[in-house]
Amino acid sequence: MMVLEQSETSRLGPVFDSCRADNRAALIGYLPTGYPDVPTSVDAMIELVESGCDIIEVGVPYSDPGMDGPTIARATEVALRGGVRVRDTLAAVEAISQAGGRAVVMTYWNPVLRYGVCAFARDLESAGGHGLVTPDLIPDEARQWIAASEKHRLDRIFLVAPSSTPHRLVTTVGASRGFVYAVSVMGVTGARDAVSQVVPELVARVKAVSDIAVGVGLGVRSREQAAQIGGYADGVIVGSALVSALGDGLPRLRALAEELAAGVRQRTFM
């Protein structure tokens, strides 16, 4: 089978290369801009950088978050009530970059359309962003974004799920750059006690067609889960658990991030 090789222009490629050299997965932490307020959310993202997160996913709160679990949905509501704007997310990306971190934005597609696809790509590049995670955008409908991301050297992170057909998987992986975001179901996110067994098979399916890095979002909330997923994935993505920890304050967030960072460094091979 032909293997799709990742473009050398990937902004996040060197991050994954560095982690592989350390024989570990990358830790990718998600927080929404504006929770519990904009300044605290930015401080929290910088805490993640300082606590060992290799990539920060900066969320754009959206009023119709169809794929968010209850923890992130509640945080998004708080952020929207506080008046958060897309420009606050771009400012957060800039702050992360200035702190020595690497940021990607995670957003539903509608806010980008409203902002303007080309303008958003331009401003994300200017802020020091590395790419965009688009959970509700499929490559077939992403022509404008693909063109803008090429112009502004931004990585494109699309989602794959166990339900992805072979054709859909190849199409999605081929359109992605930086990493592919693997989920257990194409649906709601959230922390879980047990990690799914179908996702290692999904990662293997991606690896059969491409050398792109694969990040896994599976509701991770413990060092042990981070170690387990880090045994087969290139990146361990944590969202809901970090949002919950932030609800208890920055010290709790830092403690969890440090625990997860230790987890990816003691990967457990299946």
Swiss-Prot record:
Pfam family, one: Trp_syntA
Keyword Secreted assigned: no
Pathway per the UniProt entry: Amino-acid biosynthesis; L-tryptophan biosynthesis; L-tryptophan from chorismate: step 5/5
Known function: The alpha subunit is responsible for the aldol cleavage of indoleglycerol phosphate to indole and glyceraldehyde 3-phosphate.
Xref: HAMAP family: Trp_synth_alpha
Similarity annotation: Belongs to the TrpA family.
Record protein name field: Tryptophan synthase alpha chain
UniProt source species: Mycobacterium leprae (strain TN)
